[in-house]
Regions:
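Conserved alpha-helix/loop element of class I SAM-dependent methyltransferases that forms part
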Residues: 10-30
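Conserved class I S-adenosyl-L-methionine
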Residues: 31-39, 156-179
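Class I SAM-dependent methyltransferase SAM/SAH-binding core
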Residues: 42-45, 49-112, 117
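Short alpha-helix
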Residues: 93-100, 186-203
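A short acidic, Gly/Pro-enriched loop at the edge of an enzyme's catalytic core
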Residues: 119-128
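A short SAM/SAH-binding and catalytic strip from SAM-dependent methyltransferases
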Residues: 127-138
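A short glycine-rich, Lys/Arg-flanked "PGG" loop and its adjoining helix->strand segment in the class I
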Residues: 141-154
Length: 233
């Protein structure tokens, strides 16, 4: 992330200069946008730069997060200790968002809540953006349904592993063989066919486009899913 004063904040992923491709060049000016899983806020701030009226949301606490099951995993062996370790990390992530929020003079609203509770919220948005989070959800199907229920116009699931299968398939996104933290939060690759079915059920048509991001200095390409509403709310 490059801040307004020219200073840079580094991280493993870099999509600077690629945001428009990342969201499939979807127009955002004048639209209300919900950024789900905002993390450091990069997508929210980029959407604001393009004239969107943004609300950002993320996990309230680590209790909202799930880990792959392993006997040696602290998440399963001692959940209280796992929460005590993870909540400070989540606070650091939130602090980085608020630092950027002040530096960019952002006007984005923020809500911290589990994804499945967003449907209790009496708000709808023109566009819902979920950037590279679906593979990190143990229940991506319900989450996609939530995104769709909140979107008046479009859902954009950015830079996300997609199985090429046209059947109604959930494939594991990794071998599920390592309890190491960097691997234990990656769950599923939803198939093209299953994306189409879920969104059709919710009144959307689906397009898959390719986009690029830099991971630890190496370019990587993945699909972005653009679902456009064809059945009005």
């Amino acid at each position: 992330m490059t801040l307004p004063d020219g200073s840079e904040v580094s991280g493993p992923w870099d999509i600077r200069g690629r945001f428009d491709e990342y969201i499939g060049h979807y127009p955002l000016r004048g639209k209300t946008v919900l950024d789900v899983g905002t993390a450091t806020g990069f997508l929210a701030f980029e959407a604001e730069k393009r004239g969107a009226i943004v609300t950002a949301t993320d996990a309230h606490s680590a209790i909202d997060m799930k880990s792959l099951p392993f006997q040696t995993s602290l998440h399963f062996a001692n959940k209280a200790a796992w929460l005590a370790a993870m909540d400070p990390w989540l606070i650091t992530l939130k602090n980085s968002f608020w630092f950027g929020w002040h530096e960019y003079k952002s006007k984005a609203d923020v809500l911290y809540a589990p994804i499945d509770r967003l449907t209790l919220w009496d708000r709808k948005f023109d566009v819902v953006i979920a950037g590279a989070i679906v593979e990190h959800l143990s229940d991506p199907i319900t989450a996609i349904g939530v995104f769709a229920s909140l979107a008046k116009e479009a859902v954009i699931i950015g830079f996300t592993p997609v199985s090429a299968n046209e059947g109604l398939i959930l494939e594991t996104a990794t071998p599920w063989s390592s309890p190491e933290p960097e691997f234990s939060y990656t769950w599923w690759a939803v198939s093209r066919g299953l994306y189409k079915r879920i969104f059709a059920n919710m009144g959307f048509d689906v397009e898959f486009v390719e986009c690029e991001a830099i991971c630890n200095g190496v370019p990587e390409r993945r699909p972005t899913i653009i679902a456009r509403r064809i059945s009005p709310l």
